A protein has these predicted regions:
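Short, well-ordered beta-strand core segments
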Residues: 40, 65, 80, 198-199, ...
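Phosphate-binding loop of NTP-binding sites
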Residues: 8, 90-238, 242-252, 282
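Short glycine/serine/threonine-biased micro-segments
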Residues: 16, 35, 43, 48, ...
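Positions that flank functional sites
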Residues: 72-73, 142, 183, 262
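Adenine nucleotide phosphate-binding catalytic loops in nucleotide-utilizing enzymes
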Residues: 211-218, 222, 248, 252-300
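N-terminal leader/targeting and accessory segments in enzymes
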Residues: 1-92, 241, 266-271, 287, ...
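Active-site regions of enzymes building and remodeling cell-envelope glycoconjugates
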Residues: 76-84, 149-152, 251-258
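Fold-independent oxyanion-binding glycine-rich loops
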Residues: 27-30, 43-44, 69, 83-86, ...
């Protein structure tokens, strides 16, 4: 149970209708999953509008409703809070409800068209091998140390994501490596999270069925780095034409990697064969049981 007033910390509220001194025991964006004592957040999605299911959520036991527009008929026993953007509110509220857990771990987000899964998984395996208890959130699977958790999206919805991070923290994870898709950024699924760092791999003309224009796609990816605080790091691919654009407005400490130019992390392929990759990274020769130039970038 938590006081709703505390969960609403930093949410941009437009109006409040109904009793305010209430406690909630759950947050939901799916009216079918609402139970007694829950707060229902009506999000406007790409396929459906949560505002159409407010009445169903109340019937299932919701005691509070977060929405962008009040329904036509109000219930005297329900608290209605109108916000500017329900999706943004969901991210912030989930962050607060689960104890602002992303601030208690080292959370690193990886974005880009290609390489997200590989980079996040490599970091997970590297830090696990160094003795850290880690979490992984990826398209292939989510993992809490050695325990595998089913994955349904590249980046889960805000409530599921914060719940998962809370489980990781409760299990003793100190580091979490997460794929952050452009869809998730555009839909504010990572809103409210504190990232210790962000990594950009590359960008190509994919997902334009969703983002419509390449500029909108770039803008979505870039928003991860725009939101990073000065205490975080931002690492980008200098060989991608948009690599520097991604970091142009970030407050984070900037780093670049490259196979072509002298940067913070400079790599050179010595050999690429069926036996693996032989690389020189910042004058240190290393061998990896992976092949291909694309994996050389992922390893950097």
């Amino acid at each position: 149970m938590a006081l709703l007033q505390q969960i609403l910390y930093k949410v941009n509220i437009i109006s409040v209708t109904g009793p305010t001194d209430i406690e909630v025991n759950d947050l939901q964006i799916d009216s079918r999953k609402v139970s007694n004592g829950a707060c229902f957040i009506a999000e406007r999605g790409t396929l459906s509008d949560g505002h159409h299911f407010i009445e169903a959520a109340i019937s299932n036991g919701a005691v509070a409703v977060i929405c962008e527009k009040l329904p036509g008929v109000l219930s005297d026993r329900i608290l209605y809070i109108v916000v500017e953007n329900s999706a943004i509110a969901a991210g912030i509220m989930a962050h607060n409800f689960y104890g602002q857990v992303s601030e208690k771990i080292t959370l690193v987000g990886v974005t880009g068209t290609n390489g997200k899964t590989t980079i996040a998984t490599l970091l997970f395996k590297l830090f696990s091998g160094l003795g850290y208890k880690c979490g992984l959130i990826s398209t292939v699977q989510n993992q809490i140390d050695k325990k595998i958790v089913a994955s349904t999206h590249t980046t889960p919805d805000a409530i599921t994501l914060n719940h998962l991070l809370a489980d990781m923290h409760a299990s003793g994870c100190s580091h979490v490596f997460m794929e952050v898709s452009s869809h998730a950024l555009h839909q504010h699924r990572v809103e409210g999270l504190h990232f210790a760092g962000g990594i950009f791999s590359n960008i190509t003309h994919d997902h334009l069925d969703y983002h419509k224009t390449f500029d909108e796609y770039i803008k979505a990816k870039k928003s991860l780095f725009d939101s990073l605080p000065s205490s975080s790091f931002a690492l980008s691919n200098a060989d991608d034409k948009r690599g520097s654009v991604m970091l142009q407005n970030t407050k984070a400490k900037k780093y670049f990697y490259s196979l072509k130019t002298l940067t913070d992390f400079k790599g050179k392929i010595i050999e690429d064969s069926l036996l693996g990759l032989e690389l020189v990274i910042n004058d240190v020769e290393v061998h990896f049981r992976m092949i291909g130039t694309f994996n050389a970038y992922n390893l950097l």
